[in-house]
UniProtKB/Swiss-Prot annotation:
CDD domains, alphabetized: MECDP_synthase
Gene3D superfamilies for the chain: 2-C-methyl-D-erythritol 2,4-cyclodiphosphate synthase
Name of the molecule in the record: 2-C-methyl-D-erythritol 2,4-cyclodiphosphate synthase
Source organism of this protein record: Salmonella typhimurium (strain LT2 / SGSC1412 / ATCC 700720)
Cofactor note: Binds 1 divalent metal cation per subunit.
List of residues binding 4-CDP-2-C-methyl-D-erythritol 2-phosphate: 8-10, 34-35, 56-58, 61-65, 100-106, 132-135, 139, 142
Cofactor(s) needed by this chain: a divalent metal cation
Catalysed reaction equations from the record: 4-CDP-2-C-methyl-D-erythritol 2-phosphate = 2-C-methyl-D-erythritol 2,4-cyclic diphosphate + CMP
UniProt site positions, description: Transition state stabilizer: H34, T133
GO terms of biological process kind: isopentenyl diphosphate biosynthetic process, methylerythritol 4-phosphate pathway; terpenoid biosynthetic process
Length: 159
């Protein structure tokens, strides 16, 4: 078994909506990013890549490459997952924690779980997504951006 951890953060800027966990969420602010700014899928992709010792999202999809400008993070997750499967790994489970004062994530979490399960080709019970605040402390608490952490458990596929 192999465990990976991922972290991502994006500052608010411009106009909304935002995309988190593949879900378009109405909000007055947008997120500043080279791709679509999906902190949940970026952290998750990093966790999966880390567990497979394949580097990170920036190595695989560099923000200096114009090909990834405005990229759909679900597509990036699916491509990373293909590479991980090619190394002979299967998914144990993933756990994602979104850290944001606003907007409220709870109404969107069920759809995030559906999208992640679809993208990883796994069962819903292998995907957990939750959200928390920092009780108005730090940059997320001041409403300056959103952060996310994720962990992933991979196992070698049976031969």
């Amino acid at each position: 078994m192999r465990i990976g951890h991922g972290f991502d953060v994006h500052a608010f800027g411009g106009e909304g909506p935002i995309i988190i966990g593949g879900v378009r969420i109405p909000y007055e602010k947008g997120l500043l990013a080279h791709s679509d700014g999906d902190v949940a899928l970026h952290a998750l992709t990093d966790a999966l890549l880390g567990a497979a010792a394949l580097g990170d999202i920036g190595k695989l999809f560099p923000d200096t490459d114009p090909a990834f400008k405005g990229a759909d993070s679900r597509e990036l997750l699916r491509e990373a997952w293909r590479r991980i499967q090619a190394k002979g790994y299967t998914l144990g489970n993933v756990d994602v924690t979104i850290i944001a004062q606003a907007p409220k994530m709870l109404p969107h979490i069920p759809q995030m779980r559906v999208f992640i399960a679809e993208d990883l080709g796994c069962h819903m019970d292998e995907v957990n997504v939750k959200a928390t605040t920092t009780e108005k402390l730090g940059f997320t608490g001041r409403g300056e951006g959103i952060a996310c952490e994720a962990v992933a458990l991979l196992m070698k596929a049976a031969k």
